[in-house]
């Protein structure tokens, strides 16, 4: 199949040189699901915590899928929940997972549709698709391993590395002096940008912290802010205009995640780009965001939207409309997807999930680099096994 230079990642994936089950007789013969709880070293607070809408975050629920085919190919994927929902995602995944057995592992779209219909009564967004995410991601991992390629290469990578920024050093619970130390450490560790949380009850405190960070970084070093849906429309306009002096890459989630009209008005009114989308849980929701001109940067999250398959559709739509890409969290997956995006993306560096895997991503020159390992390039650590509280298996154990 001939591919044009501007073919999208979905086209590349479908044209990938992989053997089908018709040629190999391969079938999915074993599926294992696990629910692990990853503890955080320090409770984490953003604007929603300071205003009493949420409690500090102390752990992350990780839902893991391990899939093995008759020919011996394996795939690993995961979903997550940062607060309530992890056990529900795991329970739904457990109810639908036996539909995988006997399927051709290359028929990812067919399997996805089958899993959606297995849980049709609970919808096509939210927890229903987040339960499919670890399975879908594991199938893409397996597909790339079968091809003998990193996933990014299977998808037709535009680049071997992606510029990255650090989020975890600038949370609202972190004192300013420590934030400034974190900024220095991040730069020394090869990070290419810094994101600072905003949304303090006292808006002047946001400006004070932002001023100090910009002075520490210098005028040109990439800097972003994230309000975590804290502001109303009036406050967002006022704060957005005050922040234009700081030469920000973007203002993230200034409004409620589902306020498409408000984000569109804000994007039109401000010179600073608007970024949002991390809380959306389906292709259709992202379609509304993109077609509504509600953001300059789209921030889909593969585990939240249902896996790599819907993420690729979001990427395709975003690229057609000239939107920039800055995926949320899950850098282990999003590095590969970002590398396959035609416009230069940003990748969020979050070290929280590092203990789950035996391998780590390489940071250098402000960028995150794709390894030559096949698939996603990760194997589960013994620590991940120790944190696991629930497991279930289907099919013939390897």
UniProtKB/Swiss-Prot annotation:
Belongs to the mandelate racemase/muconate lactonizing enzyme family. GO terms for molecular function: galactarate dehydratase activity; hydro-lyase activity; L-altrarate dehydratase activity; magnesium ion binding. SUPFAM superfamilies: Enolase C-terminal domain-like, Enolase N-terminal domain-like. It catalyses: L-altrarate = 5-dehydro-4-deoxy-D-glucarate + H2O; galactarate = 5-dehydro-4-deoxy-D-glucarate + H2O; L-altrarate = galactarate. Competitively inhibited by tartronate. The enzyme product is the enantiomer of the product obtained in the galactarate dehydratase reaction catalyzed by OB2843; the enzymes thus differ in their regiochemistry of dehydration. Its EC number is 4.2.1.156, 4.2.1.42. Disruption phenotype: Cells lacking this gene lose the ability to grow on L-talarate as carbon source, and are impaired in the ability to utilize galactarate as carbon source. The active site is at residues 197, 328. It holds the Pfam family MR_MLE_N. This is L-talarate/galactarate dehydratase. The record marks 301 as: Increases basicity of active site His. PANTHER family: ENOLASE SUPERFAMILY, MANDELATE RACEMASE, MITOCHONDRIAL ENOLASE SUPERFAMILY MEMBER 1. It is an enzyme of class 4 (lyase). Binds 1 Mg(2+) ion per subunit. Substrate binds at residues 46-48, 82-83, 195, 228, 348. Mg(2+) binds at residues 226, 252, 278. Its cofactor is Mg(2+). InterPro entries: Enolase-like_C_sf, Enolase-like_N, Enolase_C-like, L-talarate_dehydratase, Mandel_Rmase/mucon_lact_enz_CS, Mandelate_racemase_C, Mandelate_racemase_N_dom, RHMD-like. Changing residue 328 to N/A: Loss of dehydration activity on both L-talarate and galactarate and loss of epimerization activity. Signal peptide: none annotated. Keywords: Lyase, Magnesium, Metal-binding. Homooctamer; tetramer of dimers. GO terms for biological process: amino acid catabolic process; carbohydrate catabolic process; galactarate catabolic process; L-altrarate catabolic process. Catalyzes the efficient dehydration of both L-talarate (also called L-altrarate) and galactarate to 5-keto-4-deoxy-D-glucarate (5-KDG). Also catalyzes the epimerization of L-talarate to galactarate; epimerization occurs in competition with dehydration. Is required for the utilization of L-talarate as a carbon source. Also functions in galactarate utilization. Is not active on other acid sugars.
